[in-house]
C-alpha cells in the first residue's frame, strides 16, 4: 500500500479518526457553520484564539525552505502562527488548519507542547512516519476544510461518474477547487467518503505531479489554489498596532509591549534559522 495511505489516521487508527471527526464536527458547528472555509481559515484561527481569551498573531511570510509549511509557538501568552507563503495557497490553507488543531489541543486539551513550538513540514503533511498528534492534525485539517457531508453534496452537484480514471481525476480537480485542499489530501478525502477504492487512491496519488501540471497549464479549476503568493504581512501587523494606538483602541503601554513582543519573536525566529 502507498505509504501515505498506510500512515493516514483514517487507515492507521479508525477509532481515533472517528474521535477526531467528532471534534471537527463540534468545532465546525461552533466556529464555522455551513461555510466552506478555503482561505477564511486564517480569520477562523484568529476568531478561535480570541474567543478563548488568547492573543494571536498570524505571520504570512515567504520562507526559503519549502519543506517547512508552518510553525506555531507561544511567547508570553501570545500565540504566534507563521505560514510559509512561498508555498502554493492550498498548502498554506492546509497548514493553517493543521496548526489550528495544535492550538485547539493547547487551549481545550491541556497540551503544553506549543510552549516548545509546533512545526509542520512537507514530511508531516505527507503523514509518513509521524507522531499521532500530527496524523490527528492532518485529519482535523481536512475535516474542517472539507466536511464529509459537503464533499458528498459537491460530488453530487458535479455529477461526474467515477467509472474511469480520467473522470476520477476530473472529480478530484473539481473538489480541490471547491475546498482548496491539496491534491493528496483531496484523494484521501475521497477515500474517507467511500467515493473511491484504495487501488484508485493509490493510482491518483501516483499522478499528483502530472495532475497539478495539467491544472496550472489550463488556468482552470483548481489553479487559483496552486499559486504561490509570497505574501509578507509583518509590516502590516506593525502598522496595525500603531494605528490602533492612534485611534486609542489600545494604550501606549500596550502598543509598546506588542511591538516589543513582535520584535522579540522575529528575532528568536532569525536566531533559530541561523542555528539550523
Model feature map: region roles:
Residues 1-276:
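Active-site hotspot residues in diverse enzymes, especially metal/ion-binding acidic/histidine motifs
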Amino acid at each position: 500500500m502507498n505509504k501515505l495511505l498506510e500512515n493516514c489516521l483514517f487507515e492507521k487508527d479508525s477509532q481515533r479518526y472517528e474521535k477526531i471527526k467528532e471534534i471537527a464536527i463540534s468545532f465546525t458547528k461552533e466556529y464555522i457553520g455551513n461555510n466552506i472555509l478555503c482561505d477564511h481559515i486564517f480569520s477562523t484561527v484568529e476568531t478561535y484564539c480570541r474567543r478563548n481569551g488568547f492573543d494571536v498573531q498570524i505571520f504570512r511570510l515567504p520562507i526559503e525552505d519549502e519543506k517547512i509549511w508552518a510553525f506555531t509557538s507561544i511567547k508570553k501568552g501570545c500565540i504566534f502562527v507563521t505560514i510559509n507563503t512561498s508555498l502554493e495557497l492550498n498548502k498554506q490553507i492546509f497548514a493553517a488548519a493543521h496548526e489550528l488543531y495544535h492550538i485547539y489541543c493547547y487551549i481545550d486539551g491541556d497540551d503544553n507542547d506549543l510552549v516548545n513550538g509546533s512545526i509542520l513540514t512537507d514530511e508531516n503533511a505527507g503523514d509518513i512516519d509521524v507522531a499521532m498528534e500530527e496524523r490527528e492534525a492532518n485529519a482535523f485539517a481536512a475535516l474542517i476544510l472539507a466536511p464529509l457531508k459537503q464533499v458528498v453534496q459537491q460530488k453530487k452537484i458535479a455529477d461526474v461518474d467515477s467509472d474511469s480514471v480520467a473522470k476520477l481525476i476530473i472529480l478530484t480537480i473539481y473538489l480541490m477547487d471547491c475546498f482548496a485542499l491539496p491534491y493528496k489530501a483531496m484523494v484521501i478525502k475521497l477515500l474517507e467518503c467511500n467515493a473511491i477504492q484504495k487501488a484508485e487512491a493509490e493510482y491518483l496519488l501516483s499522478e499528483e505531479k502530472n495532475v497539478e501540471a495539467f491544472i496550472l497549464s489550463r488556468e482552470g479549476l483548481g489553479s487559483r489554489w496552486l499559486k504561490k503568493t509570497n505574501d509578507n504581512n509583518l509590516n502590516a501587523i506593525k502598522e496595525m498596532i500603531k494605528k490602533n494606538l492612534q485611534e486609542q483602541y489600545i494604550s501606549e503601554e500596550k502598543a509598546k509591549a506588542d511591538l516589543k513582543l513582535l520584535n522579540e519573536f522575529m528575532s528568536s525566529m532569525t536566531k533559530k534559522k541561523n542555528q539550523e
